[in-house]
Amino acid sequence: MTKIFAYAIREDEKPFLKEWEDAHKDVEVEYTDKLLTPETVALAKGADGVVVYQQLDYTAETLQALADNGITKMSLRNVGVDNIDMAKAKELGFQITNVPVYSPNAIAEHAAIQAARILRQDKAMDEKVARHDLRWAPTIGREVRDQVVGVIGTGHIGQVFMQIMEGFGAKVIAYDIFRNPELEKKGYYVDSLDDLYKQADVISLHVPDVPANVHMINDESIAKMKQDVVIVNVSRGPLVDTDAVIRGLDSGKIFGYAMDVYEGEVGIFNEDWEGKEFPDARLADLIARPNVLVTPHTAFYTTHAVRNMVVKAFDNNLELVEGKEAETPVKVG
């Protein structure tokens, strides 16, 4: 019987895992809540493939340990593959899949909601109400329809975000080094990032974490932006120079910042710090600000998305194990 072993299975994933198991009675499924490390590879002994999800690196040592146990089929329940030692994976003959599209709507909706909350100064108003200060001023809001929304990256998520913001009545402009022909026909694209920075009241990032994009939001780019700009990052933490954003907030140039990702988030997000010493003073400062919205990498976190991540990853792994062409293979090496 085919056997698949899954790592880092969360409670919220178990109903969808059970659903997949019930539909595949001829496949033995075992799992753990532990991450995949050299020390936990032994748990998958006898498996034909593994299904994984973690921010921790898939190191050369981890991949070697899997290969030593006869396992070279690995399916991610997420998109990102930048934490995999691809050179080692290629050397060992790994086949890897990911889930590149599990719910663009989940992430795009979150970005749109957070942008609107910043514009309406919701956090500041909520804090006032909690103090029983029910005066209106000075927390007056801005309407989405009065904004020019700049979208950097027009892939699946960026396009859904554009549709949502247009639904509010905003004017939407976009920039992408790979232009979508349909969007280009409709005249969404500006010629450069500088053009977008100069025009946009709200800027939302929807690009990958590749070297060319690291700290694309920095002192220089912020200086080119409009006064009272709103910045939204639901993509990858390293896209933003956090210190530069803090300087922009302190100067008043940036009206508000919504962040679902953070360049130092590994080991901090998805952990309970209540009653404990918080490990990152800079992040604590951002969390405390009335014009900053912090969510711990949960833009994707909906039942729809989690189901797709589990089901598609297991489907992919079974296809690899059976020698078939997987639906969403990752280029190794």
Swiss-Prot record:
TM helices/strands, residue ranges: none
SUPFAM superfamilies with a match to the protein in the record: Formate/glycerate dehydrogenase catalytic domain-like, NAD(P)-binding Rossmann-fold domains
InterPro entries, A to Z: D-isomer_2_OHA_DH_cat_dom, D-isomer_DH_CS, D-isomer_DH_CS1, D-isomer_DH_NAD-bd, NAD(P)-bd_dom_sf
Catalytic activity: (R)-lactate + NAD(+) = pyruvate + NADH + H(+)
Highest taxon of source: Bacteria
Keywords for the protein's UniProt record, in alphabetical order: NAD, Oxidoreductase
EC number: 1.1.1.28
Residues at the catalytic site: R236, E265, H297 (proton donor)
MF terms (GO), sorted A to Z: D-lactate dehydrogenase activity; NAD binding
Top enzyme class: oxidoreductase
Binding residue positions for NAD(+): H156, I157, D176, V207, P208, N213, V234, S235, R236, D260
CDD domains tied to this protein: LDH
Effect of substituting H206Q: Increase of activity
Gene3D superfamilies referenced in this protein's UniProt entry, alphabetically: NAD(P)-binding Rossmann-like Domain (3.40.50.720)
Listed result of changing R236K: Decrease of activity
SUBUNIT field: Homodimer.
Entry protein name: D-lactate dehydrogenase
